[in-house]
Structures are given as structure tokens and as C-alpha cells.
Amino acid sequence: MSSESRSASSPVAPDDIEEGVVLRPKFDAHGLVTVVATDARTGDVLMVAFMNDEALDRTIQTGEAWYYSRSRKRLWKKGETSGHIQKVLEMRVDCDQDAVWIKVDQTGGAACHTGRHSCFYRRIDRGGDGAPVLIETDAERKFDPDKVYGK
């Protein structure tokens, strides 16, 4: 389905969204939908990002993950700088189509721009005073971000 037909403003019955066979993503007010990327092999959550309609189309057409960067205000292909591309093996939408789940083969072993396997490398615990503290659970870096991104 083309982005033009997906973005058409014709009313859609809830049953068509929840039980139908047509992709009708519910983009937010900024034209974005939340995407959760997981490692297809391990099931680990790798990252949470956003797609606009064009990123979603490119992902479907190419089989590689494309996202929309809210900070840079542009499309980006995962791995365009690092080479750590996400090959999409399966895509799903949730019941009301306002979130996308992609199962990927993460090349290079790292999804996070910090060089780690996952962006979820810290656990929230409570310190001695009861205040929340972050505990690193994955210190291993697959690459040095300063070398890859030139920071």
C-alpha cells in the first residue's frame, strides 16, 4: 500500500484497524509512530525509535530499518554511519496500529550509538536512600563511538 493511500483521511471502522488486513498506521500529531526493534535471534529489546510514513515505506520496501530522527529532523538508515545495519526479518503492528515491532538481524552486534548491543544497558534500582539509581548491566562495547562517529 502506498503512503498516499495510507494517509488518506477516509474514516476507518475500528474493526478494520484491529482485525483487518490493511496496514493503516496511526501516526501521532508529529507524523510519527513508535517502533520497538528486537533481536530476532535472542528476543532482546535493542532500541525504541520512531518512523514517519517515508521511513516505514523504505523499511517495507528495502527490508532494512529506516527511522526518523526527531533531533536531526531527517530520515536515517540504521547503520548508515556505523555499518551496523538492521535487516528486518519480521514486522508487526499492535492492535490499534499506533506502534510497530520489528524483529531484526543486527549486523555488527551493536544497535546502540554508545557501542553496546542494546540501548537498554542500565537497570533502574533503588539506592540506599530509596532514590532511583542506574546500574549498568552491559558494559561491553562492540565499537568505540568516538572512532565511528568522529566525536
UniProtKB/Swiss-Prot annotation:
Gene Ontology CC entries for this record: cytoplasm
Gene Ontology BP annotations: L-histidine biosynthetic process
UniProt-annotated binding residues for Mg(2+): D94, D96, D98
UniProt pathway: Amino-acid biosynthesis; L-histidine biosynthesis; L-histidine from 5-phospho-alpha-D-ribose 1-diphosphate: step 3/9
Binding residue positions for Zn(2+): C95, C112, C119
Protein localization: Cytoplasm
Cofactors (names): Mg(2+); Zn(2+)
Keyword line: Amino-acid biosynthesis, Cytoplasm, Histidine biosynthesis, Hydrolase, Magnesium, Metal-binding, Zinc
Entry's EC annotation: 3.5.4.19
Keyword Cytoplasm tagged: yes
Details of cofactor binding: Binds 1 Mg(2+) ion per subunit.
Catalytically driven reaction(s): 1-(5-phospho-beta-D-ribosyl)-5'-AMP + H2O = 1-(5-phospho-beta-D-ribosyl)-5-[(5-phospho-beta-D-ribosylamino)methylideneamino]imidazole-4-carboxamide
Molecular function as annotated in GO: magnesium ion binding; phosphoribosyl-AMP cyclohydrolase activity; zinc ion binding
Family stated for the protein in its record: Belongs to the PRA-CH family.
Complex formation: Homodimer.
Record's function text: Catalyzes the hydrolysis of the adenine ring of phosphoribosyl-AMP.
The protein's name: Phosphoribosyl-AMP cyclohydrolase
Organism for this UniProt entry: Rhodopseudomonas palustris (strain TIE-1)
Lineage per the UniProt record: Bacteria, Pseudomonadati, Pseudomonadota, Alphaproteobacteria, Hyphomicrobiales
Gene that this sequence comes from: hisI
